């Protein structure tokens, strides 16, 4: 399985890139895409820029151009929940738009939330140091 990893900032993807072996750079859409491996896993890594539109565009690109079967969006984010600190790893089981008005409910294909893929979530849990918490 090939994994796409996207992050909004170069600083967010730097540690992932350092862990990769057999790295090759591909220039597409004005960005550098890096293919390689982390252990036995095939990785496609790109800095997508800030915002949900950029995230969607580059998630699409790693799927379409590099045939990624799963996409992981990494990086910093504002925290709403109590007990979440700086440098904590947060894995979502469900995600929702915070900036959509209720008027959107009547327009297809509106969805209030999106469920995380259970297999991908389980995979991510394997690589968090505090997964038991």
Indicate where each model-derived feature is located.
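Conserved small/polar residues in nucleotide/adenosyl-binding loops
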Residues: 127-133
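Metabolite-binding pocket within alpha/beta catalytic cores that recognizes anionic/polar moieties
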Residues: 2-123
């Amino acid at each position: 399985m090939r994994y796409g990893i996207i992050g909004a900032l170069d600083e967010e993807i730097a540690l992932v890139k350092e862990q990769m072996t057999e790295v090759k750079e591909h220039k597409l859409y004005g960005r550098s895409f890096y293919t390689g491996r982390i252990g036995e896993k095939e990785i496609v890594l790109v800095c997508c820029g800030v915002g949900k539109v950029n995230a969607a565009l580059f998630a699409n690109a790693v799927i379409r151009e590099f045939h990624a079967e799963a996409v992981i969006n990494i990086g910093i984010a504002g925290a709403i929940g109590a007990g979440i600190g700086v440098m904590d790893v947060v894995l979502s089981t469900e995600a929702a738009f915070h900036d959509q008005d209720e008027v959107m409910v009547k327009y297809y294909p509106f969805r209030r939330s999106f469920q995380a893929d259970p297999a991908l979530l389980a995979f991510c849990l394997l690589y968090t140091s505090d997964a038991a918490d």
